[in-house]
Each structure stands twice: as structure tokens, then as C-alpha cells.
Design a protein with these regions (language model features):
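Conserved structured core elements
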Residues: 75, 151, 228, 241-245
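An acidic- and aromatic-residue-enriched active-site/binding cleft used to recognize and process polar
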Residues: 203-205, 239, 250
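Conserved small/polar residues in nucleotide/adenosyl-binding loops
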Residues: 252-258
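N-terminal pre-Walker A segment at the start of P-loop NTPase domains
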Residues: 210-239
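Structured core elements
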Residues: 53, 132-134, 199-201, 231-235, ...
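N-terminal accessory targeting/assembly segments
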Residues: 1-196, 207
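Active-site-proximal "nucleotidyltransferase
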Residues: 200-206, 210-212
Length: 260
């Protein structure tokens, strides 16, 4: 592993050279409280952006163990961090100038679903973090503009990392809400079968979406209320008692489109 000063010196050395000189930056660099890894360098400024990752030791990130020891809670925390990091990157994306995709900073943008993603991973034993994202290495035409990349790696990115990947910089209540909600959801999934159910819809849910291409709930929609004959309840670890409609196998069917 090399130091951040070695990366800075390398960038100064290749400045104004032809774009393939950026290939020399591949490798890992110690930035003190995190490691920057340049995993893949794009072939030219108009190609798919370079692949970069940030590695933060659990001892530095300092997330409490109860946020990552259980898989469902860990995935929820990773989802939360990915969204936070994405917002930070969006704030500084294209502040570094150049041709093509120069200055782009982006991470995969999750929908409303909380899923396991390679873009953000946390070790279950120590809480080590890995964030994977894209950077458009700056150029003037097809000539290296290392001064702009230096801004990204030494000014913009450190701010994004410090504001989104360290527990002390985050809203503690929001992080725990995300983890607690995920654990409650997993509790329901784990206890459906013992009640002879395949799905559950909570009372007060908003089921209609605002459009066929949107995941957002419809405004002013009538909240769902379970029919008395299908009501079931669960006592969740964090939210307490919740009531709604339990769906049994006999109520599950597929609706196929009619072919004229």
C-alpha cells in the first residue's frame, strides 16, 4: 500500500500526459482514517468511469456492534450509508471540470427496496466498511488533467467520506430506526409460516402507487384496513404490537393477462 503523498506526487508527474498515463494510479493509498483503492481506470474520458472504492476499518468507523452483527440490521445500515454517501457524491459531482465524463462522482442509486448490494458492504465481525463507486478521471480532450483529479481525491472525496461513513457524523436515531425497522420486518417473515401465512399487510398501509412507474405512495389514498375475518397480529421486537391482514396459501393466485 502506498501513502496519499505518493498518489499526489504521481498525479503531479503525469499531469498533461496522454490519458493512458492514468493507468499508473491503480492501487491502494492510505489516507489515514480510510484507504482509497483505484480498482479500474477508464480508457479515455468518454468511456465508462473509473471504478474506485473506499475502505474504512471498523475501529475507525465506530459503529456499535448491535448495528451489524445481525444480517438484516447490517443490510439496513449499509442501505442507509449508501444513500448518505450517494447524496454527498451528488453534491460534488462535476465540480472538477474537463471533457467527457470528467469530474463525475456516482454510486449505484437504490430504489425503495432494502437489498444486499456490492456497492456497500460491512463486515459482520469487525464492522469494516467498503464503498464502491465511480469517478470520471478529468481530462482536457484526451490529455490528463491531474490537478482536477487531485481536487477530487484530496478535497471532495475526503469530505464525502467523513460526512457519511463515520458513525459520529450521522444521525444516530435515524441509523437505529433503519436497523430496527429491518429487524421488525425480518421477525414477521420468520413467523409467517407458524401462523400458516405467506404474506402480511399491515393496517394503515398505503397500497396504491402514484403511477405505474413510481414506487411512491398515492397522495390522499385510503389507508388499508384488514377485514375482520383475516386479521392477525404480531408483537415485534421494536415497534411492539402490529395488526393487519394475514394472507394464506389459499388466497394466493396469479392473474395472467388476457390474450386477444
Amino acid at each position: 500500500m502506498q501513502s496519499q503523498n505518493e498518489l499526489r506526487n504521481l498525479l503531479q508527474r503525469i499531469d498533461h500526459k496522454s490519458y493512458p498515463a492514468y493507468k499508473d494510479t491503480r492501487g491502494s493509498y492510505d489516507f489515514g482514517n480510510y484507504v482509497l483503492s483505484i480498482d479500474h481506470v477508464q480508457g479515455d474520458p468518454f468511456a465508462a468511469p473509473s471504478k474506485v472504492s473506499v475502505h474504512v476499518r471498523g475501529g475507525a468507523a465506530k459503529f456499535p456492534a448491535d448495528l451489524y452483527r445481525m444480517k438484516c440490521r447490517r443490510l439496513a445500515v449499509c442501505d442507509y450509508l449508501l444513500r448518505q454517501f450517494g447524496r454527498e457524491l451528488e453534491r460534488v459531482s462535476f465540480k472538477a471540470k474537463g471533457s467527457g465524463k470528467s469530474g463525475l462522482l456516482a454510486v449505484s442509486r437504490p430504489g425503495q427496496e432494502v437489498l444486499e448490494r456490492t456497492a456497500c458492504q460491512m463486515d459482520e465481525a469487525k464492522g469494516d466498511l467498503v464503498l464502491r463507486f465511480e469517478v470520471g478521471f478529468p481530462a482536457n480532450g484526451r490529455t490528463v488533467n491531474a490537478r482536477e483529479l487531485e481536487k477530487i481525491f484530496f478535497t471532495f472525496l475526503p469530505e464525502c467520506v467523513l460526512h457519511s461513513l463515520f458513525y459520529k457524523a450521522l444521525d444516530e436515531k435515524a441509523v437505529y430506526r433503519a436497523a430496527d425497522l429491518a429487524e421488525d420486518q425480518q421477525y414477521i417473515r420468520d413467523h409467517l409460516k407458524e401462523q400458516g401465512l405467506v404474506a402480511f399487510v399491515a393496517d394503515a398501509s398505503i397500497l396504491p402507487r402514484e403511477s405505474g412507474v413510481s414506487g411512491r405512495p398515492m397522495k390522499d389514498a385510503v389507508k388499508f384496513t384488514a377485514p375482520e375475518s383475516m386479521k392477525v397480529s404480531f408483537v415485534l421486537p421494536h415497534a411492539g404490537k402490529i395488526q393487519g391482514m394475514g394472507i394464506t396459501v389459499s388466497y394466493t393466485h396469479l392473474t395472467l393477462p388476457t390474450i386477444a
